[in-house]
Amino acid sequence: KVVESVIVRQPSFFSGLGQLLSNFDAPGWSSWLQWHLLSGSAPFLNKALVEENFAFFGTTLSGTPELRERWKRGVSMVEGVLGEAIGEIYVAKHFPPEAKSRMLELVHNLLEAYRVDIAALDWMTPETKAKAFEKIDKFTPKIGYPDKFRDYSALEISPDDLIGNIAATTKFAMDYEFAKIGAPVDRSEWHMFPQTVNAYYNPGMNEIVFPAGILQPPFFDLGADDAANYGGIGAVIG
């Protein structure tokens, strides 16, 4: 498809790349690319390479004394490449639809409280208040998990080809991003997985995102009364 324009966040990267390519050194680039391929693959190769790679990048450069257990590294890797698939399983067990409904009600009530507070401000002009109310009207709360999970059906995974799986998931992720070029902005997209214990406010989209991972005790508990939940996650959001 023909794309007339794109947003480039770091134009200097492309000008610098152009200068490098103008003096193209094929053997040098080949060596550089081979090194990056080997370095990027090292954490997924044999035990000796994994440990040697960690000794330099983990301990020498970052000061991390010990390599994490293999199963923990495996979980992190799978979560990184299949995050929403893992998230769908997580919310089925830890965040039922009732929890999402109750959280949406909580956020709605907080927004209504903002309206009351803004209306009572004597230092804010009517025009400014109108803009504030307009922002509240357009505010988007994303709670727990996306309404539609990402479709991974086109991704082929083999149980006996780790490096091949890494390559396949990398390509899948890149294709997903490239497909956005020239397409309308997907305002329903999440930039955190449901199982993530964190949250964020995106001012550009005027949205808050609270994944199911952080909507657990002590912040939020479906079995607790409103006082506990408004004093917990309500205080964080407000």
Please annotate each region the language model reported.
Residues 1-105, 109:
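Noncatalytic, helix-rich "gating/capping" subdomain that lines the substrate-entry/channel surface
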Residues 8, 34, 159-231, 236:
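Active-site-adjacent "gating/activation" loops or surface patches in catalytic cores
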Residues 103-118, 132-143:
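Short amphipathic alpha-helical coiled-coil/interface segments
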